[in-house]
Regions:
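Intracellular loop-helix junctions on the cytosolic face of multi-pass helical membrane proteins
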Residues: 2-12, 147-148, 161-237, 251-264
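Hydrophobic core of transmembrane alpha-helices in multi-pass small-molecule transporters
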Residues: 115-134, 291-307
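Helix-turn-helix DNA-binding segment
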Residues: 397-457, 461-462, 472-480
């Protein structure tokens, strides 16, 4: 009982602080939610009956892989992607064109060959557009704090499931309208989210040299391949798209981060997908309630969980090293090829003529071996901390700033925008709000005393104050 009382006290405590984390969530919620709902309706769990010579989801995935590789290779020349509307326009145009092609393939009175060609074209355009959307989304999301990244991502994926639920009962005409409207809404909301960012927090066009955290990508590759081995056999309601299994994982993660952000142990979450996926594959041959359904949900939930954790690690590394997350997000998107490879391996085993029980045993053994190798080789938390500066694996590591710091930074950003301060003046205002004196500010920014005095004078003039004490009062700071 005392433990339960403490738990309830933690939930009641700091309601205003928790609400602060969700300020401005709506454009993010609808951006990723609409995009994921569109993918589900278009290819993951198609709402239209389409005739094609092969799996359209594979075409979609391969197109997404190709565009992700292109973005990763050209990241230095492309960033910041959201600075202009060009990349957003290409993404929206590709997804809308994909919808129109898929609708025509399913509804237009065309020869069978033409319908198949349109379906393949639609899937390819969809993969291209969605691949671009994911890197655009990652770039915008990287500008906010880690706790918000976690909350916004989980809430958005949960919203995607809700959108699919309401679209699934529509007739053909309304589904077609939804398939056209959803990608447009996603891009418009993404633009709104980007424009709401303070200028000082927006992505920099300068990309310093960096190396890729290949062990993290290798971890995701192993899980992607393992998931692909069973993707075709997953029970209804399971899958990496906007499914019930996704909703379960995202709801639990969101609630945990929202109510217990200071206690959330990302390190424990980091290890939990191994247990889920191994149990899922070992349950494949089982009968009854512990058979295909439970196995499918465990496998799907493990893959959804590892995807969130890997993304969070990449955001953390990008923030700490000061590099663009676009290249990391593009490589993550390209790893969808391992899902396709896993499906291909499963189909090859099926074509070999082996009994189903032997196939299940071989696949389960392969997955267990892969997961053991991953645990022995890839789970190097000390390396993540020492080489990449990762701290989120510690208990409470998800919270970078206290609620008071969040409020102070929001006030500084608001005042800087209202007073039209330059980026350098905004930096100085941030440090003043933190209570730092002149020598500390000069030391941190490597500027001369005269330069600091000139900038400070401009800040006072633009903000309509006469001295530091009045500026502190304007900022709501306790320190003069």
């Amino acid at each position: 009982m005392p433990a339960m009382g403490k738990l309830l006290a933690d939930i009641r405590k700091g309601r205003e602080d928790r609400a602060l984390y969700l300020a401005g969530i709506l454009p993010y919620l609808f951006a990723l939610g609409c995009a994921r709902a569109w993918v589900t309706l278009a290819v993951a769990a198609p709402a239209l009956r389409l005739a094609a010579p092969f799996d359209l989801h594979d075409v979609f995935d391969c197109a997404m892989v190709l565009i992700s590789i292109a973005v990763a290779l050209a990241a230095r020349r492309l960033v910041p992607l959201n600075a202009t509307g060009a990349v957003r326009a290409v993404s929206a145009g590709a997804m809308v064109a994909a919808s129109l092609a898929l609708i025509a393939a399913g509804a237009a009175p065309l020869p069978e060959g033409a319908q198949a060609a349109l379906a393949v074209l639609g899937a390819a355009l969809g993969g291209l557009g969605f691949g671009l959307f994911l890197v655009l989304w990652a770039e915008v999301l990287s500008c906010i704090s880690l706790i918000r990244i976690f909350l916004y991502t989980t809430a958005s994926q949960l919203a995607g499931v809700v959108f699919v639920f309401f679209c699934s009962g529509l007739d053909g005409l309304r589904v077609a309208c939804a398939m056209v409207v959803l990608p447009v809404a996603a891009i418009l909301c993404l633009r709104m989210a980007f424009r709401a960012l303070p200028v000082a927090d927006r992505p920099s066009p300068v990309v310093p040299k960096f190396t890729y955290p290949w062990k993290i990508f290798a971890l995701l590759a192993l899980f992607s391949f393992a998931y692909g081995l069973r993707q075709h056999q997953l029970a209804a309601g399971a899958g990496m798209h906007s499914s019930l299994s996704t909703a379960i994982v995202m709801a639990v993660l969101f609630a945990g981060a929202y109510f217990f952000s200071s206690r959330l142990n990302i390190g424990a979450l980091y290890r939990s997908p191994f247990v889920l996926i191994v149990c899922g594959f070992l349950l494949v041959p089982s009968e009854g309630v512990f058979g295909a359904a439970v196995s499918s949900y465990l496998i799907s939930m493990s893959y959804s969980l590892v995807g969130i954790i890997v993304a969070l690690l990449l955001y953390d590394i990008a923030k700490r090293l000061g590099v663009t997350v676009v290249a990391f997000a593009a490589v993550k998107g390209a790893e969808q090829i391992f899902v396709v490879g896993g499906k291909g391996a499963s189909e090859a085993l099926g074509a070999a003529g082996l009994p189903a029980s032997m196939q299940d045993a071989l696949i389960a053994g392969l997955v267990v071996a892969m997961m053991v190798a991953a645990m022995l080789i890839l789970l190097s938390e000390k390396e993540l901390a020492s080489r990449w500066g990762v701290r989120i694996l510690d208990v409470g590591g998800l919270v970078e700033k206290t609620p008071d710091e969040e409020r102070r930074e929001a006030r500084v950003a608001e005042l800087a925008e209202h007073a039209r301060l330059t980026p350098r003046e905004t930096e100085i205002l941030h440090l003043i709000a933190q209570g730092k004196n002149g020598p500390a500010i000069r030391s941190e920014l490597f500027i001369a005393e005269g330069t600091l005095k000139a900038h400070t004078s401009h800040i006072y003039e633009k903000c309509g104050v006469a001295n530091r004490r009045e500026l502190a009062a304007l900022l709501g700071s306790a320190r003069p």
